[in-house]
């Protein structure tokens, strides 16, 4: 019986194999309808949808439709050529010398061990081979930005929120990417007029700037962000995820738990980390798929050697960690969309296949883009300065109560690169902890600060004020656009937040005294600056002001005897507010810390 079944099975296999070999492949494509199935593709790593690319070629870096007729129009590109592969001069000389030898002399030269070698293979290896054309095509703008760091502000337009949201299909699954570096400035509530907050997945990126480890991010950071979105927008905690596209925090969890659904669109403000997040998901998806495949003997030996080296060296040395991160960054640069610190880098919607799920990278939107007076912080800066600010600084190192600080006296002017000029009222003392990636400076008054920037802008590099050149990153033209803004009354510490750059923690010291003078912040027109409650109050352990028995302590004894705790966000007081155009005479107290704040 078994032999009969086996013979029937063998005969069936032969018929199937003969059927496959007799029908030409061309007839299969012509007689059957083509089917685009993403889930049935066997390990197609980080590729855009090939059918769409063949019909309408787009830049794989920014997503714009390509054209090769007009160099002055957006999307211009040059077709890749198939030239000869470049060969080192030394290798070329050696190749010519080997080719000049006859077979007997070449055997005598190469066959010193007595083994027979294939001479044709050796000659073929030394001959230049044709260069393989790249699979992806980039526009000239992206290539200049990637390989030459050449940028033009006109080629990086920023779309409005209305233009982005109206271009999305009605059945799109939205993933709202929000930066943790300037939270909640990158969260625009106008999105909820197009889609309910309950239908959106919120992904908080750049969390490595807030926490030193992933465990602390999940332990302290996740409860705060879940509380915030639930109190403000009624969002369930399951729809809030903390990530870091730079070091792949929570990316495997995001992919495995089914939080990312098919036909998802990554939306968010400019420089919120959408493209970096997508590159991270593509890279992690590739690694997860590679683990499922069988390793070759060479790959297995290489992996075992790396594991042995890490085990013998402690596996946690800073050099090993840096080397691993550099390797991951190099792999990410070869995958997915282009990511840049330049706002407006992505210009079109780009579809990607992430483990059988279609995801779309969407251009970032700005605020008040349709206004005739639209400007932002990055419109004042050079590309190198944008890169510096966008990197950010670790808040867990520079923004806590243990971090070093500078003391500002009332009437003095505190500035970070000329982005803003903050003047506290007379009679106050302020501790400032800078969490912006540029050195702060304190001037005697605001007039001295303005005069210094004007002098630096009008002099050459060796002028009398050359020592102040590194103090400012804003150009001298920003002085004409400075407008005074006022911080609403507050009690205790606050964060002065700059959109796209970071924040400065301000902690007044001493007994609060009534004053008629407001807190003034001079801001260039278009630069968005808010104030918020200290975010470290809700994501790190801070001083509670009580001893171990629960007794309240005097302020000067806090650091010596106070216990630490993490506050939970309740939403009873405003978390942030915008700067006011008029001074505020409201008096803040311990029981009413933010009397004039509004969200």
From Swiss-Prot:
Identify the keywords attached in UniProt to this record, alphabetized.
Answer: Mitochondrion, Transit peptide
- Keyword Transit peptide listed? The answer is yes
Region (Disordered) residue spans? 312-342
Question: Which InterPro entries does this UniProt record tie to the protein?
Answer: G_CP_dom, Mito_lipid_metab_GTPase, P-loop_NTPase
Q: Could you tell me where the Basic and acidic residues compositional bias lies?
A: 322-334
Gene Ontology MF: a single term: GTP binding
Main localization, broad class: mitochondrion
Q: Where in the cell is it found?
A: Mitochondrion
CP-type G domain span: 158-368
Listed GO CC annotations: mitochondrion
| Origin: domain of life | Eukaryota
Boundaries of the annotated transit peptide in chain numbering = 1-46
Q: What does this protein do?
A: May be involved in the mitochondrial lipid metabolism.
UniProt lists the family membership as follows: Belongs to the TRAFAC class YlqF/YawG GTPase family. GEP3 subfamily.
Q: List the PANTHER family hit by this protein, alphabetically.
A: GENETIC INTERACTOR OF PROHIBITINS 3, MITOCHONDRIAL (PTHR46434:SF1)
Listed name of the protein: Genetic interactor of prohibitins 3, mitochondrial
The taxonomic lineage of its organism, from the top, reads: Eukaryota, Fungi, Dikarya, Ascomycota, Saccharomycotina
């Amino acid at each position: 019986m078994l032999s009969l079944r086996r013979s029937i099975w063998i005969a069936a296999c032969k018929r199937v194999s003969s059927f496959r070999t007799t029908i030409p492949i061309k007839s299969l494509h012509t007689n059957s309808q083509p089917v685009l199935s993403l889930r049935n593709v066997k390990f197609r790593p980080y590729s855009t949808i090939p059918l769409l690319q063949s019909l309408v070629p787009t830049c794989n870096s920014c997503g714009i439709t390509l054209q090769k007729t007009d160099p002055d129009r957006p999307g211009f590109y040059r077709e890749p050529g198939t030239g000869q592969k470049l060969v080192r001069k030394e290798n070329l000389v050696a190749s010519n010398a080997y080719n000049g030898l006859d077979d007997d002399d070449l055997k005598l030269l190469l066959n010193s061990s007595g083994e027979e070698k294939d001479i044709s293979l050796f000659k073929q290896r030394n001959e230049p081979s044709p260069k393989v054309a790249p699979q992806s095509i980039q526009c000239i703008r992206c290539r200049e930005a990637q390989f030459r760091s050449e940028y033009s502000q006109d080629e990086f337009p920023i779309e409005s929120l209305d233009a982005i949201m109206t271009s999305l299909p009605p059945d799109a699954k939205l993933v709202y990417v929000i930066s943790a570096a300037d939270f909640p400035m990158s969260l625009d509530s106008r999105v909820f007029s197009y889609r309910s907050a309950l239908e959106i997945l919120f992904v908080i990126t750049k969390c490595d700037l807030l926490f030193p480890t992933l465990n602390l991010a999940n332990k302290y950071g996740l409860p705060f962000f879940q509380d915030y979105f639930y109190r403000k927008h009624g969002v369930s905690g399951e729809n809030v995820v903390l990530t870091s596209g730079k070091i792949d925090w929570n990316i495997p969890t995001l992919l495995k738990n089914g939080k990312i659904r098919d036909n998802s669109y990554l939306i968010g403000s400019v420089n919120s980390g959408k493209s970096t997040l997508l590159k991270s998901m593509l890279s992690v998806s590739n690694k997860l798929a590679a683990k499922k495949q069988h390793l070759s003997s060479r790959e297995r030996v290489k992996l075992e050697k790396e594991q042995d080296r890490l085990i013998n060296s402690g596996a946690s040395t800073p050099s090993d960690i840096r080397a691993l991160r550099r390797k991951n960054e190099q792999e990410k640069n070869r995958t997915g969309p282009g990511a840049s610190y330049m706002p407006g880098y992505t210009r079109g919607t780009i579809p990607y296949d992430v483990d059988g799920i279609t995801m779309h990278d969407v251009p970032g939107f700005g605020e008040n883009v349709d206004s005739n007076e639209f400007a932002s912080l990055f419109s004042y800066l050079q590309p190198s300065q944008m890169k510096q600010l966008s990197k950010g600084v670790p808040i867990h190192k520079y923004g806590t109560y243990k971090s070093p600080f500078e003391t500002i006296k009332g009437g003095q002017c505190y500035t970070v690169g000329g982005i803003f000029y903050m003047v506290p009222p007379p009679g106050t003392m302020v501790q400032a902890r800078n969490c912006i990636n540029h050195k702060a400076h304190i001037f005697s008054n605001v007039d001295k600060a303005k005069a210094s920037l004007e002098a630096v802008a009008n002099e050459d590099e060796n002028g009398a004020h050359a020592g102040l050149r590194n103090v400012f990153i804003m150009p001298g033209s920003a002085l004409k656009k400075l407008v005074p803004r006022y911080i609403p009354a507050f009690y205790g510490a606050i964060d002065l937040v700059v959109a796209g750059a970071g924040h400065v923690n301000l902690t007044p010291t001493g007994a609060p005294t009534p004053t008629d003078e407001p807190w003034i912040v001079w801001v260039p027109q278009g630069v968005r600056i808010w104030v918020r409650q200290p975010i470290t109050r809700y994501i790190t352990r801070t001083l509670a002001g009580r001893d171990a028995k629960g007794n309240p302590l005097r302020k000067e004894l806090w650091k010596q005897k106070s216990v630490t705790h993490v506050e939970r966000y309740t939403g009873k007081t405003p978390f942030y507010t915008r700067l006011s155009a008029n001074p505020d005479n409201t008096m803040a107290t311990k029981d009413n810390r933010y009397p004039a704040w509004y969200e």
